[in-house]
Amino acid sequence: MKQDTEADVRTDTAVKILALFFVAIIFLAFTTSPIKTGTKEGERAPPLEGMMYNGSGWTQFDMNDYMTTNWTVGDANGEWLVVEFMDTDCTYCLRDADEFGQVADYFMKISKDTDGTPAWNGPVVNFVASATELDIQGHETSREEIISFRDKTGDSSCAGSSCSSRNGDPHNFIYVDDIDQENMQEWKIPGTPSYFIIQPDGIVAWVHSEHPQEKVSDGLFRIFNEQGLMPNE
């Protein structure tokens, strides 16, 4: 009889512990707020995938390959990402191509000072253009046209003019084929160009539509200053 009582006590204790465990799990499930996926500041950026052109050929691109999930604010070693949604027949994209290329070269540390060191000494910022085809009459793009726009080569036409004659130098950042609008729809992009700054952990840090008075470079400088990531002169 004594043995049965002890067994009952042990069973009862185990049941109570198990019950407390499940209560704790349920509590965490209801009190932990997962970061929402979206394109507003503070949200986790949606997936961005496709075949990319890097100047030499087309290879697979996955934005997750650029992310560092354990990155923390203030860590200067993390690599940031600027995403541009564009259309090779978009006149505004053509207008911005020169300045955007210069900004990309600066923050990607391609631009050099007279002594040969990078002009920008802060965190590395990678740039990617997701090239789509808007549902607008006269907007017809192709991989050949994307290459022509990026490299300023070939005889493809961009917005009625030769792509090779657009303002600025050839771009050094990658272009992703989004002709089918898959990325554009995933990100709910209303029009082009649209710009986003993504933190190393994949969180949206800046959206141009929320800061129309700022350019991409302004947004980067402000964010780096706020996070203590501006290099010492």
Question: What do the predicted segments below correspond to?
Answer:
Residues M52, M86-D89, A104-S111, F224-G228:
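Sec/Tat-exported extracytoplasmic proteins
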Residues M1-F61, W206:
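N-terminal targeting signals for export/organelle localization
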Residues G74-N77, A119-G122, N167-D169, K188-G191:
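Extracellular/periplasmic catalytic domains that process cell-envelope and extracellular macromolecules
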Residues C90-L94, Y195:
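The canonical Cys-X-X-Cys-His
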Residues R166-H171, V176-G228:
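Thiol/disulfide oxidoreductase modules built on the thioredoxin-like
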Residues L94-R166, I179-E186:
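Structural microenvironment flanking redox-active thiols in thiol-disulfide oxidoreductases
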Residues G78-L81, M86-D89, L134, G191:
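Short pre-active-site segment immediately N-terminal to redox-active cysteine/selenocysteine motifs
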Residues P47-L81:
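A short beta-strand-turn-helix
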